[in-house]
Amino acid sequence: MFKYKGLTFIALSFILLTTLVATAIPLLAQYYIDNYITKNIATAGLYILAGYYGLFILRVVFTFIGEYYFSKVAHSIVRDLREESFSNLQKLGMSYFDKTPVGSIVSRLTNDTQAVADMFGTIFSSFLNSVLMFVVTLTAMVSLSWQLTILMILFIPIMLGSVYLYQRLSSRLVEITRAKLSDLNTKLSESIEGMRIVQAFNQEKRLLDEFEGVNKEHLRYMSKSLAVDSLLLRPAMALFKILAYGVILAYFGLSWQTAGFTAGLIYAFIQYTNQLFNPLIELMQNFSVLQTSMISAGRVFELIDNTEYEPKQSNSDYKIEEGNIEFKNVSFSYDSKQDVLKNISFNVNKGETIAFVGSTGSGKSSIINLFLRFYEFERGKIFIDGVDIKDYSTKELRDKIGLVLQDPFLYHGTVESNIRMYNDNLTENDIEEAARFVDADNFIQELPDKYQSKVTERGSTFSSGQRQLITFARTIAAEPKILILDEATANIDSETEETIQRSLEKMRKGRTTIAIAHRLSTIQDANCIYVLDKGEIIESGTHEQLLEHKGTYYKMYQLQAGMMQ
């Protein structure tokens, strides 16, 4: 907030002016009543009356300006929070995303940051206005009748006790309600992202029932919060105000003749009592919003302060020139309890291709995750060109290692921007050459706007083969020394596979390649194939050697060959 001290100063200034004007209104009304109305010379007091309404107009104008600038500060703060949260999100390692639902992250970046904005824009300004109004009004009341002011002050501890009771009852409910809202967002996110599967397997009814269950849970706790609010907020405060009015009227009724109270003074004191209690009532009404905002702020700052960063790399000047790879006795566990990789060792020379095969959960993807430095490992060593992989800079690893995933991901934009990936060093000719190299140029040229054709979210308007070819072009445009192929042909139909395989062969030429294979037919020309089982290498050799061995690889090959027939 101090970052916007100029805007904050303007907002505070107008809040102070609003308070002073609000305090002056009852005094002017008292003067008008006692000096003009009670003396039957109301006509002469028209100027006073005009001033009275003028103060009301000033109060409205000052209130608007103060709230406008506070809202401006609030929206600037929420912008900064979202940028800071998203910036830190980019630095977090895969372990954070493994255990945190996407919907929960989205909820923190949208709903929770907006709740923080509400706190600064509405609650904070209301709090300052209430405190100033309380202090100035109390001073004015003392000047009118210090005895009655003391009686009014006696109500304050009772009201504060009500605030404390409300806080004790509602804080836990608010926290649970926000958690249920996060669950709701998570369920929505999962449902929308997996809509193809939902419809394909006729799961709409089950999904609707699950969503209704989560939604009802959210409603249940929201209803409990509203019940507490309805009991301890407006009704309780209204009761205290009525009791205070009764005390005022009784006091003036019993002592007006001896104390010399005037009608104007009585009117002013009632108005000031209103102004004294209204800030407390407003604070109570905003307390539930404040609690929600505080819990949301905690969730946002939990994300900002999260330090589960991706593994740190050295800032050295080491360069990947050849692409020789060595894994030496590497073991790894995601949960520090059960190893998913056990004593993995292998070598890949420049320009060679190796492949990993095995059942689901055998450790294939874990090897890739460690090599790409998505996770930190402590046992064993990984070398590139004889240099420990931890000694390379992150930029060097990202620049020299190209990744092609099983599920190609395209971003909203154009075909060109998806190949370029915001690398300004690439020219249009570089992009087209990369596309031609992987045989993507043919279908791109047939698009209405060619390389400027629009790409929707995840590239849903393209076939899986077309999406894969675009990601191939993206990888080749970066000119990597090492290629990682994570089951790049697993989701491709047989007709498209021929084009994909031809492109992959050209991509692999002269580059060190590590492939995870689902279809054994795609890696028969690999220099070495490693068979994994429960995190261990149980077989290795060329395609022919492994078939002759008639072990696990042979059985896998026979099974796939039988399925093909």
Set out the residue ranges of the language-model regions.
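ABC-type nucleotide-binding domain
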Residues: 246, 312, 318-565
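Helix-loop-helix
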Residues: 40-48, 140-154, 228-298, 303-304
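An intracellular "coupling" helix at the cytosolic face of ABC transporter transmembrane type-1 domains
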Residues: 3-6, 94-95, 111-120, 124, ...
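Transmembrane helix-loop-helix hairpins at lipid-water interfaces of multipass membrane proteins
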Residues: 8-62, 69, 142-147, 259-263
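Membrane-integrated ABC transporters
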Residues: 1-22, 37-48, 66-70, 74, ...
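Alpha-helical transmembrane segments of multi-pass membrane proteins
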Residues: 55-74, 121, 125-132, 153-177, ...
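Hydrophobic alpha-helical transmembrane segments of ABC transporter permease domains
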Residues: 13, 21-25, 62, 110-155, ...
